[in-house]
Regions:
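Carboxylate- and glycine-rich phosphate/diphosphate-binding segment that chelates Mg2+/Mn2+
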Residues: 133-236
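ATP/NTP phosphate-donor binding region
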Residues: 1-75
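Active-site nucleophile and cofactor-binding loops and adjacent substrate-binding regions
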Residues: 52-53, 79-81, 241
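Short, acidic Gly/Pro/Ser/Thr-rich loop/turn segments
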Residues: 3, 26-27, 124-127, 164-166, ...
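Glycine/threonine-rich beta-strand-loop-alpha-helix active-site module
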Residues: 59-162
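C-terminal charged capping/lid subdomain of soluble metabolic enzymes
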Residues: 233, 237-278
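Predominant activation on well-ordered alpha-helical scaffold segments within soluble catalytic domains
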Residues: 6, 33-36, 47, 62-65, ...
């Protein structure tokens, strides 16, 4: 990742990067250090913003956007999982907006400009490294809503299976549940196209086949590579059926009262589906 990132940074001539992280695992496990060294090697000044919540809050987005403006940031680098990447997309949009970030969430058409985003993915899960959308929470209004814009596609995403080896088993499984949730909500629609159906079935088989392998041997890079492929394709539209999908995965956005608790997306989905089934 470091070598490829240094090449990208040099060719694009960025000057100041906001590096966004979550709870600290990327610092403990060494991924952040590699990114910081790549930025330093390319002559890019670094401003760090850490502590993104498990369900990113608009208050954090506003603070980070203000920091971008104050420091003259011209690049945002997300290091972590989907929630860090979601927050970073919102930060990219909010940095160029004359007003609170929540205005953009309520009306996505207000996104007129955005900072470029690079992502360094550390878990196979949401596929946020390869789409143009985010989900942001507002504790004050008790809402959790999507933000999407063509200006929010990452300019480049670095996806290295070695960066996922240190993910705990519990979080690993939660990520794979999230992957399957994305695909199943698209699979169970009326009149799904045969091409999309076949693609989704193949990806689901890949997740089912490789998950036990990774849990048995976390250092199996081949299995982790396959799971990262499955994650990356989940939300980028390649399997878009052009029909309304199931609501189970989307319903998690409505559980705003749960936002005070750091519960991963997929575990909420599983609980809700089980409740409906019993």
């Amino acid at each position: 990742v470091a070598d490829h990132m240094a090449d990208e940074l040099t060719s694009r001539r960025y000057k100041t990067a906001l590096v966004v992280t979550g709870g600290g695992s990327v610092r403990r496990n060494g991924e952040l250090d590699a990114v910081l060294k790549a930025l330093e090697a390319a002559g890019v000044r670094v401003v760090e913003f850490s502590g993104i919540e498990p369900n990113p809050r608009v208050t954090s987005v506003d603070r980070a956007a203000a920091l971008c403006r104050a420091e003259g940031v011209d690049l945002v680098v997300a290091v972590g999982g989907g929630l860090t990447m979601d927050a970073s997309k919102a930060i990219c949009a909010a940095a160029g907006h004359d007003g609170p970030a929540w205005e953009l969430v309520l009306d996505n058409s207000l996104v007129k400009d955005a900072l470029p985003l690079m992502t360094v993915n550390t878990i196979a899960a949401t596929g946020s490294e390869y789409d143009n959308s985010a989900v942001i929470s507002n504790i004050e209004t008790n809402e959790k809503l999507p933000l999407a814009s063509d200006l929010l596609w990452p300019v480049v995403s670095f996806i290295d299976p070695a960066y996922t080896i240190t993910v705990p088993a519990r979080q690993t499984v939660a990520g794979y549940c999230d992957i399957m949730s994305h695909y199943l909500e698209q699979y169970f629609v009326k009149d799904i196209s045969p091409v999309a159906e076949g693609l989704i079935e193949g990806i689901l088989r890949t997740v089912i086949r490789n998950t036990p392998v990774v849990l048995e041997n976390p250092a199996d890079l081949n299995a982790r590579s396959e799971l990262l492929w499955a994650s990356t394709l989940g939300c980028n539209g390649i399997d878009n059926t052009h029909f309304e999908a199931m609501a189970e995965h989307i319903e998690k956005h409505w559980f705003a009262p749960l936002e005070a608790f750091p519960v991963p997306f997929s575990r909420k989905d599983v609980v809700e589906v089980l409740k409906r089934s019993l």
